[in-house]
Amino acid sequence: MVQIGNEVINGMLWPDGKLPENWNNFADLMVAGINGVYDGCAANYYPKIMIHIDQGGNKEKTKYFFDRLLTYDIKFDYIGQSYYPWWHGTLLDLRENMIFMAKEYKKPILLVEVAYCASPTEYKNKPAPYPETPVGQKEFLESVNEVVLNTPDNLGAGIFWWEPATMGGRSTRDFFDEKGNVLPVIAVFDKYTRH
């Protein structure tokens, strides 16, 4: 699988591909990227193409982006979304958007960037959906997995955790404490392995 761009809700390669003002240029850049992937492939081998935006919990922006993208007849196989609850809405918002994307676009959906803090970081001035503790981090990932696994038509394709191995340095979203000890969140991967 190849992702064309990263979180491209605002376009890419500004100013030429900046959105919303340059949709024609953006579409040309997307087609060029996809064609470049295919041109670099061995005969009869074509990796899946993913388009990734950062609106996991925002159905309206997701709809606007993909509806507009599809008017350009852009061919892709997977929808990628980022989902950080302090930026992208509640788990209910994520669930509603996953259901919408599955029914509307009928493509597998990956959460390509997901994370939650194991110590207080993001929710200093507002209530957190889960405690920002190692156990709260684990509970958050379990809940996100449930949303993905319950996406209609089995189109919830998986989750990628953002930066799990920074070991308590610049991030509290990783899977290890400052001494390198693994946090409880790691057990979620055993619990939710698809067979």
Regions found by a protein language model. Name each.
Residues M1-Q3, Y46-M50, K75-G80, P108-L111, ...:
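Structural preference for beta-strand elements that scaffold enzyme active sites
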Residues W86, P108-P120, K126-H195:
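Substrate-binding cleft of secreted/luminal carbohydrate-active enzymes
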Residues M1-L70, I74, G89-M98, E104, ...:
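Active-site cleft segment of glycoside hydrolase catalytic domains centered on the general acid/base Glu
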Residues E7-I9, Q55-G56, S82-P85, A115-C117, ...:
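Catalytic metal-binding/acid-base residues of hydrolase active sites
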Residues V31-A32, D77-G80, K107-I109, I186-F189:
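Short, surface-exposed, polar/charged, turn-prone segments marking secondary-structure boundaries
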